Amino acid sequence: RLDNKSDFNFSTESLKVKLNKYALLTLHRPSNVDFEIKFKEIVGAINKISKEIPIIFSVHPRTTKRIKEFNIEFSPNVFLIGPVPYLEFLNLWRDAQVVLTDSGGLQEETTALGVSCVTIRENTERPVTVSKGTNLLAGTAAKDIEHSFRMSLKSPQKKLRPISLWDGLAAMRIVEILRWV
């Protein structure tokens, strides 16, 4: 059963997980969830990883449909929750040991807060999160997801990762360019 945002109290204790001792999972991209064989392979990796660490899976509505359609089952250590409001979701991934995702935005947000991230995709439109951030690009094969997860655990403890040009001064730089033009 998926708890919806109105009855989930956002306490990791209610899920029997401890701060910084769980993984947060999100999957929503059609390329990952709309094809049964690929989705089941990804879930196989997730179920194996859950033997090492509890996983909180914030399930997108389109993903919920595919879980039912493909009759996908998760191990008992994968806790499925419905979508949650942004600030509560931010707390979930900020307090996670690692985030497993196919979301582009989460790659940036985890890098900004120094949270390890494993991106379950073949490519990323945010390469700076891999080269200078906390993101590992895993691909979608089960063995690669599992390997990247284990590599993420070897990452240094959380610390803010300043990325050049992520300093909040974009408007000032644009004005300077416009003055030059």
Identify the meaning behind each predicted range.
Residues 1-8, 136-181:
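Leloir-type glycosyltransferase catalytic cores
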Residues 61-77:
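Short, structured helix-loop element that forms part of the nucleotide-activated donor/catalytic region
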